[in-house]
């Protein structure tokens, strides 16, 4: 009954439509919005789920000429005699009330975020189950969005497993290091990850203006001593920083920092970007961390008097990351794949000893959040429909 129409009428000089639903809730719809979203074949291409009506053809002051309704539909005639029919459930879903809009945004963007520190229970699923079953793939990606990290176990100890996950999502994110890349000790390394030294907490690739959203790392070979992985929930650390030192939070969320990456791999590259280390949305919520100390440029485009306060704020942020309450340490085994949110988590690695042979080998890849979210929405629909 919630999507059943009790009454529909035009208001405000016919520039507004009001619907009273059988659950006694009311919805208001501007006439211009209704005309813009007419679902007829002249205005909407159903096969592409795309609007055909041109913006320049829309009368922004349009009113409703005629309106009738039944329990399941509203029928509107416009001043130029164009005719539109709207389904009740379609209208109810797109109600413009604050509560209805918030509900729909939650359905579209999966905003739930579970913060964690050293107490993290690392979410773990079976690699083959994720590839084979939609329910497991949905659990994988929904947990990845909520917690920020999922470990998959049971993959092989051969290269190529991250490519399989890329196909499961849609496709991988190509960077200057290739579709996939090998993390191992290399002579004349073109990235600090390709050494045996300690890697401090960082996000990957802030040197790009659009850093990859999701990272996949598959353990092919693991060293006996050292090489442990460390992760920290950057969003949780940001909350702590904002509470403990609001000025430091303000500096890191307002100062543009230069990042650079120059070298040769998939092709030759010379990359430059500018980011705030803590990136906020229009509501002041943290949406991305952009920080890699290795690729933070020596060029710093700020007035001299702001340099030292920036370093003080950054040190405070890094110290919070490295606190025992914040970081989680684990060791990957051959056949493990960790998948994590590169916009939220910062990751690092403990050093390990170099030998005459390669003692530690990971294969990595990236995915874009748009690709991941697309697959997540499709999987949810399949699981809910029992397909």
Swiss-Prot record:
One of its GO terms (cellular component) is mitochondrion. Pathway: Amine and polyamine biosynthesis; carnitine biosynthesis. Keywords: Carnitine biosynthesis, Cytoplasm, Dioxygenase, Iron, Metal-binding, Oxidoreductase, Phosphoprotein, Zinc. Zn(2+) binds at residues 38, 40, 43, 82. The modification Phosphoserine is found at residue 351. It holds the Pfam family TauD. Fe cation binds at residues 202, 204, 347. It is found in: Cytoplasm. One of its GO terms (molecular function) is gamma-butyrobetaine dioxygenase activity. Its main location: cytoplasm. SUPFAM superfamilies: Clavaminate synthase-like (SSF51197). It catalyses: 4-(trimethylamino)butanoate + 2-oxoglutarate + O2 = carnitine + succinate + CO2. Its cofactor is Fe(2+); L-ascorbate. Belongs to the gamma-BBH/TMLD family. This is Gamma-butyrobetaine dioxygenase. It comes from Pongo abelii. The lineage of its organism: Eukaryota, Metazoa, Chordata, Craniata, Vertebrata.
